[in-house]
Design a protein with these regions (language model features):
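Conserved catalytic core of the tyrosine transesterase superfamily
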Residues: 1-224
Length: 224
């Protein structure tokens, strides 16, 4: 509007330059997402194990790949059996931009993934190559139907409610992975490589350490 007024001769050059020099009001918003606490992860996984069902074993493995390897929801559902290297205990996925990356599993992550693979590999014949499949009635693995992204979202939501854990998104598991890497003293470039990011600025947004410390700090204030 100001430019049009200046162009039409309704305001003089001095007024126009004054208006141009005024900077817009800057603001910020609280970033979305969070990193799950270790006790929350323990509750979720324990709840899965306590069921003593194939669904529980499968879901525990999904939790571990999300928080222990930083896999996106799409990467989890599209993970294929030939992407799992049992010798090196590594998992290979195709991420955003058709970029392939290899992630080494920790002992804990591998233990949970192996438990699921033990049952999954018993039903390889005439099936899809996906690691994670639909399970009927708790015990029947349907190798013709891969797990979907929406099914993973619903599973996490239900598990959180059943375990009395604060609601979180599938991507929060990925944020948890990045935050744990930072907590272990890894530099941002190492975290970026493991996350499959192109930009280190993107990786830094996944670091939730300062946010959690800031929130906890206010709880320690004694007003009176």
């Amino acid at each position: 509007m100001a430019f049009q007024s200046w162009a039409q001769g309704l305001i003089d050059d001095h007024t126009w330059m004054t208006i141009k020099s005024i900077k817009g009001v800057r603001g910020s918003r609280i970033e979305k997402g969070r990193a799950l606490q270790r006790k929350e992860m323990a509750k979720l996984v324990f709840h899965c194990e306590e069921e003593k069902t194939l669904i529980g074993i499968r879901d525990a493995a999904i939790f571990m790949l999300g928080a222990g390897c930083g896999f996106r929801r799409a990467e989890i559902v599209n993970l294929c059996l030939d992407g799992v290297d049992k010798v090196n205990r590594s998992v290979r996925v195709i991420g955003k931009g058709n970029k392939e990356r290899l992630v080494l599993c920790s002992d804990t992550v591998w233990d949970y993934l192996s438990k699921w693979l033990f049952y999954r590999e018993k039903v390889l014949e005439l099936g899809i190559p996906n690691v994670f499949c639909v399970i009927y009635k708790g015990q029947h693995i349907d190798t013709s139907r891969p797990l979907t992204e929406s099914a993973v979202y619903a599973m996490l939501k239900n598990r959180a409610a059943e375990s009395e854990v604060q609601t979180f998104t599938p991507h929060d598991l990925r944020r948890t992975f990045a935050t744990r890497l930072f907590e272990n003293g890894n530099d941002a470039n190492i975290v970026r490589e493991n996350m499959g990011h192109s930009s280190i600025l993107t990786t830094q947004r996944y670091d939730k350490r300062d946010k959690e410390r800031a929130l906890r700090a206010t709880r320690d204030i004694h007003v009176i």
